[in-house]
Design a protein with these regions (language model features):
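Dinucleotide-binding Rossmann-like beta1-alpha1 core, especially the glycine-rich loop
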Residues: 89-166
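Helical element adjacent to the flavin cofactor pocket in flavoenzyme catalytic cores
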Residues: 236-275, 284
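C-terminal segments that line or cap access tunnels to active or ligand-binding sites in enzymes
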Residues: 344-457
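N-terminal export signals
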Residues: 4-6, 11-33
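A glycine-rich dinucleotide-binding beta-alpha-beta segment and adjacent secondary-structure elements
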Residues: 208-218, 380, 438-502
Length: 532
């Protein structure tokens, strides 16, 4: 069995950058591939998992006439792109800000014919950052304004700030504008970490904190994240500003689910995949669910976790040893701790949407990554009613207090949690939540503790329960190794999600399209060269 090759690091970065530009995609190519498969109903596809990657894959295949069965163990589609109701409040599970309009998500959703069914709101600022040493608000869709504000607070690092953001803008010009320079900034940054790149220009750790503030979105420290990747991803935010799918992220998930069903695809909720079935020729023939019902398939796209796929759903000895080794070398990403608050009044005194609060005097050492006592970690505050009018019912406010979290502090509660013995676990999560509220009340929202009408707390174990992701991971595997190809060494098995392509709304949507396209290429090849 031939192993699907991994991309070398340099090729991986180049492929990632090409994929981030809609202009690099052959948008007509998908339809041409579909036309090459005349008897589409003879090529059924099963997708495991209705996260955004699975939804996009299923939407593409159903739109072009293929028989699609999407299996989802939960009651709703979307994975983390969903919401839940408590009293008068509807809380978004995951979305704070993304880039959709004028970027890859708009291109994908337009290609599927559903972009016009969605609306986005723009964040009023890029970010506000509050620390013991400074309080700064970075403006949205205004790279020069960001630089000017950093100049104001850190005049001693003026030249370094200018040079850092100039280099970021050059990357964007090379990537999106197709411009060429005597020295390629993409080539310069490709071998560097974010920490190394920043250190070429500035020394003040507070300035580095501001420059690297978005690294938490990718679940890695500046010493681990690739400089070029960060320049591209953060450059999108600088230029386009943070955006939000109205009225909640589940509107995006529902639009994709509606697209699937409108094109005669099936979504089976409360249906957990059990194992992938192979025929007597060792070809994939379907997926058996936990109720022992087999759903026929010529190809399977996995939007579930890779550990579950290869350890629980695949027969043993199906994977080449080298591929197994590549998987085993990967590290599960961080999870999250979130406090969802519904307030009984409007917050007229605070107008910011996203606020980072860190009260450690050496803020750069942690940069919103978890501390030994999670209660003292940096907090990301999102006040959703400052995003658009009518987010909450009149006179009330919806907000979240969130930090990244390792799984290790929660592991000791795991067995009791899944056996519904949660007293000790509940005390710990409430201790952390109360400390978060106390800190935010003192620094940002006076009187917060007296406004709370509804409070829900999500931990890594909560994430694990609802998504079945190992350790409650929110980004799949860490980005410290190159992404996996959609096509696996097992013929007919494809990957589409955070575990293969990296976490975040945009990467998993791109993964969904890539996986569906890879399936069609294999179908076309099998027609041209039938099995003997």
């Amino acid at each position: 069995m031939k192993q699907t090759p991994y991309l070398p690091r340099r090729n991986f970065i180049k492929t990632l950058l090409m994929a981030s530009s809609a202009a690099a995609i052959d948008w007509a190519g998908f339809g041409k591939l579909a036309e090459a498969v005349p008897n589409k109903k003879d090529f059924p596809v099963v997708i495991i998992g209705a996260g955004l990657g699975g939804l996009v894959s299923a939407a593409y295949l159903a739109r072009y006439g293929f028989s699609v069965t999407l299996m989802e163990q939960h009651a709703v589609a979307g994975g983390y792109a969903t919401s839940f109701d408590r009293g008068d409040f509807t809380f978004d599970v995951s979305l704070h800000a993304t880039v959709a309009e004028h970027a890859m998500p708009q291109a994908i959703l337009s290609d599927l014919g559903i972009w016009d069914n969605l609306k986005v709101a723009y964040a009023p600022e890029l970010r506000r950052i509050i620390t013991p040493g400074f309080d700064i608000t970075l403006p949205a869709k205004n790279p020069k304004g960001v630089i000017t504000e950093l100049f104001r607070v850190f005049p001693h690092e003026k030249q370094g700030i200018h040079d850092f953001y100039s280099e970021m803008e050059q990357v964007i010009s090379e990537l999106w504008g197709g411009k060429r320079f005597d020295i390629s900034m993409m080539a310069k940054l490709e071998p560097l970490t974010l920490e190394q790149w920043m250190s070429l220009h500035v020394k003040d750790p507070d300035v580095k904190y501001c420059m690297a503030v978005f690294s938490g979105y990718y679940g890695l420290s500046p010493a681990e994240i690739n400089a070029l990747f960060y320049a591209v991803a953060t450059g999108e935010y600088l230029v386009h500003g943070g955006q939000y799918y109205k009225t909640r992220s589940r509107d995006l998930s529902n639009a994709l689910a509606d697209c699937i069903e409108a094109n005669h695809g099936k979504i089976l909720y409360h249906t957990e995949a059990g194992r992938i079935v192979f025929d007597h020729n060792n070809q994939i023939s379907g997926v058996m669910d936990k109720n022992k019902i087999t759903h026929p398939a010529k190809a399977v796209i996995a939007n579930c976790s890779i550990p579950a796929l290869f350890n629980k759903m695949m027969p043993k000895n199906r994977l080449p040893p080298e591929f197994e080794k590549k998987i085993s070398q990967r590290r599960v990403s961080l999870s999250s701790f979130a406090v969802f608050l519904g307030l009984n009044k409007a917050l007229d005194q605070v107008h910011d949407y996203e606020i980072d609060l860190d009260q450690d005097k050496e803020v750069y050492k942690n940069l919103l990554l978890p501390k030994a006592d999670l209660a003292e970690s940096g907090i990301s505050i999102t006040i959703y009613d400052n995003l658009f009018k009518g987010y909450s019912v009149p006179g009330k406010t919806t907000l979240t207090l969130m930090c990244l979290s390792n799984f290790e502090p929660w592991k000791k509660y795991e067995a009791d949690y899944f056996n519904n013995r949660k007293d000790v676990y509940n005390r710990e999560k409430e201790r952390i939540a109360r400390r978060f509220i106390e800190r935010v009340e003192k620094a940002v929202i006076p009187g917060l503790s007296h406004m709370i009408e509804v409070m829900e707390i999500g931990t890594p174990l909560t994430n694990m329960f609802y998504t079945k992701n190992p350790q409650g991971a929110i980004y799949g595997f860490d980005r410290n190794l190159p992404q996996l190809n959609s096509k696996t060494p097992v013929k007919g098995l494809y990957l589409a999600g955070a575990w293969s392509h990296g976490g975040g709304y945009t990467p998993v949507m791109m993964a969904g399209r890539e996986a569906a396209e890879s399936v069609l290429k294999e179908f076309k090849h099998s027609i041209a060269q039938p099995e003997t």
